[in-house]
């Protein structure tokens, strides 16, 4: 890879604790409004396919049984996933990822939650679909050669939707190539940052775990179980929103080459610890 390309971006060496601390400082007084928007968005995104699957229960197993000669005993061992959830994920995950990036970038840069940011990505639906499908195919292909190559490919493309959010005119190949260049030397640091958010998710999953145990004990009917499941998803969405801020700041560090060069509303929150 040409050295000139590598020099365009910054190797993030800031410790994850430092990044998380600065995110907390930045979000004082506005975290609630940010998480409300984030949770509402992902509530709609996650609940729609779950509700639809109650009315369209056909699964991937039903499809295999109808159109293939696969052994029924073997099919019964496979996990059954409603087709509506599979199709929904393939056709809408890309645009939802871009919506998250636009919303969180807007919040980090302007220090205010702008719910209109969620709708802007739909103008670029076909491009987001193309990026997501290319990512999906490449990760699936490289995962066939053990899991590690697939993880590396996923990390290489992890900044694609942030790049698209900053410049929607870039082509699919330009976005993916730039993401790969940005992540050169940053993959392990990025993974380390994500691992620091594991405790947030462990806490967030407690309500869902308790609800699952209660459902098994009291044999709740399907509608009640669905409502409980939807409600216990909310803490998980909140944890995802908090992690999204850290991921976004990581992207900002790469393009701004460190905290000192942040140039937007709220920049002082990221600089106030620089002298300590």
Tell where the protein language model's regions lie, with residue ranges:
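Juxtamembrane transition segments at transmembrane-helix termini in multipass membrane proteins
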Residues: 2-10, 14, 18, 22, ...
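Alpha-helical membrane-spanning segments of integral membrane proteins, especially the hydrophobic core
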Residues: 73-90, 114-143
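Membrane-interface helix starts
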Residues: 24-39, 126-130, 184-192
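Hydrophobic alpha-helical transmembrane segments
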Residues: 34-36, 83-87, 129, 191, ...
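Selected alpha-helical membrane-embedding segments in polytopic membrane proteins
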Residues: 43, 47-50, 72-108
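Hydrophobic, aromatic-rich membrane-embedded alpha-helical segments
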Residues: 90, 94, 121, 137-159, ...
């Amino acid at each position: 890879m040409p050295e000139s390309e590598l020099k365009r971006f910054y190797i993030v060496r800031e410790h994850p604790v430092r990044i998380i601390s600065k995110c907390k400082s930045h979000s004082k007084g506005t975290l609630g409004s940010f998480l409300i928007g984030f949770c509402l968005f992902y509530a709609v995104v996650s609940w729609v396919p779950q509700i639809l699957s109650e009315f369209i229960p056909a699964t991937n197993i039903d499809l295999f049984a109808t159109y293939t000669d696969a052994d029924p005993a073997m099919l019964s061992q496979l996990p059954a996933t409603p087709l509506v959830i599979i199709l929904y994920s393939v056709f809408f995950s890309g645009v939802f990822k871009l919506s998250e990036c636009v919303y969180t970038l807007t919040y980090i840069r302007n220090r205010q939650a702008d719910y209109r940011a969620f709708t802007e990505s739909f103008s670029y639906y076909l491009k987001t679909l193309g990026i997501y499908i290319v990512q999906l195919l490449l990760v699936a292909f490289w995962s066939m050669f053990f899991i590690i190559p697939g993880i590396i490919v996923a990390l290489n493309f992890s900044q694609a939707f942030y790049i698209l959010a900053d410049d929607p005119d870039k082509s699919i190949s330009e976005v993916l190539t730039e993401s790969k260049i940005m992540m050169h030397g940053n993959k392990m640091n990025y993974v380390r940052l994500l691992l620091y958010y594991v405790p947030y998710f462990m806490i967030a999953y407690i309500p869902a775990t308790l609800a699952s145990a209660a459902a098994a004990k009291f044999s709740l009917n399907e509608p009640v179980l669905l409502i409980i499941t939807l409600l216990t998803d909310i803490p998980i969405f909140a944890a995802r929103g908090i992690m999204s801020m850290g991921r976004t700041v990581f992207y900002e560090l790469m393009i701004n080459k460190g905290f000192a060069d942040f140039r937007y509303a709220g920049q002082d929150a990221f600089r106030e610890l620089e002298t300590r």
